[in-house]
Each structure stands twice: as C-alpha cells, then as structure tokens.
C-alpha cells in the first residue's frame, strides 16, 4: 500500500522545494507538498491574531502559530480525504535509503501492527540536548516494515519537533478537537497531547 507523505513547505521557498523534489525523485518516493501558513504574508495576520487569543497563543511567536496552523490543516486534510495513516515531514528533514525501504515494504499487514493512539516518531530527536535524555525500552518495541520502533519510557516530556512523524486520522481528529476545547498550543506540544490522553505512547526510530 502507498503511505501518503505530506511535506510542509512555504510556497514561496522555491529553492528549498526544488532541492526536496530532486532528492525524492532520486529515491523514487511519491509525496505531496503542503503549503504552510506563511507568517510573513499579511493575508494570514487575521487568523494568526485569532489563534493568539486562546490557549498559550499569547506566548507564541507568529512563526510558531503559523507552524501549528500548518500541521492542523494537514490533520483536517487527512480527515477530509479519509487518509488512515500518513507521514508528515517538514522541509528541513533529511531522507535516505532507509526511509525509502521503510515505505517500500510498508503494507497492509504492517499497518495492522500500528495503534491509533500511539505516535510514531521517524527521527528528529538527535541534537536537541547535550546528552541522550530519551530512554527507549529494550523490550517494548514493534517492527514496522524495515524499522524497529521502541517505546520511549523515560523523559517523554523532552520529545520535541514536528519534523517527521507517522500519525493516524483518529489522532488527527482528536488534536483538532483539543484546539477547539483547549485553545492554541504549539505543534510539538506532545506532552500536552499525552496529558490529554490523545497520545498513549511514543515510539521512536531514527530513520
């Protein structure tokens, strides 16, 4: 089965898009650019200002709010198109043959191993701290396609970034509801999502 891939990218950033397109074409990976909300575009000022009025919006920069909005629009797109599982990448992520093989061997039987209330991180946790503070279980793991995802069992609150993750549409719908009920939050407020029982467990493999 084909696993849909969203790449969040500013429409005006042509040079970066061209580089991404070259890499994915070379690896023969299908993907779709998803136009990110541009915080520098005056047309987005109204929606950004509105998001600032709830939750922790007042503490966030325009760029952080725009990032949150971009990911939430992807969640809505997953729901609208009935996409069960999708990979969401930001345009600074580095992909390689390991990522290609993960996609190549991902099929229906692999999908059945995934749980809707778990978040599967495809990397992006290296270089965030001075030392490896995320502890991963040696025993609680799941082999999906060619990759082994291990449960994060220590310092879950240190998980950051939204650069590469695999998510189910049920979780996407719950995150949109969280915005409606709680208000604005950062796109990578994984701790908050865990506290609201939207994410049960985090599984990580640096793909």
Report the location of each language-model feature.
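An acidic/histidine-cluster motif and surrounding catalytic segment
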Residues: 1-89, 93-207
């Amino acid at each position: 089965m084909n696993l849909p891939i969203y790449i969040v990218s500013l429409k005006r950033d042509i040079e970066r898009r061209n580089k991404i397109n070259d890499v994915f074409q070379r690896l023969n990976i299908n993907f779709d650019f998803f136009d990110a909300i541009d915080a520098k575009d005056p047309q987005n000022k109204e929606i950004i200002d509105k998001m600032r009025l709830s939750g922790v919006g007042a503490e966030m920069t325009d760029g952080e709010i725009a990032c949150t909005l971009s990911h939430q629009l992807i969640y809505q797109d997953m729901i609208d198109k009935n996409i069960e599982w999708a990979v969401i990448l930001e345009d600074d992520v580095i992909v390689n043959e390991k990522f290609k093989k993960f996609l190549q061997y991902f099929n229906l039987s692999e999908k059945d191993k995934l749980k809707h209330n778990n978040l599967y991180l495809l990397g992006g946790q290296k270089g965030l701290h001075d030392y490896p503070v995320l502890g991963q279980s040696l025993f609680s793991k799941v082999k999906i396609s060619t990759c082994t995802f291990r449960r994060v069992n220590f310092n879950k609150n240190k998980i950051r970034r939204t650069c590469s993750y695999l998510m189910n549409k049920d979780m996407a719908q719950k995150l949109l509801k969280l915005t409606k009920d709680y208000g604005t939050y950062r796109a990578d407020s994984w701790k908050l999502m865990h506290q609201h029982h939207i994410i049960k467990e985090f599984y990580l493999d640096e793909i």
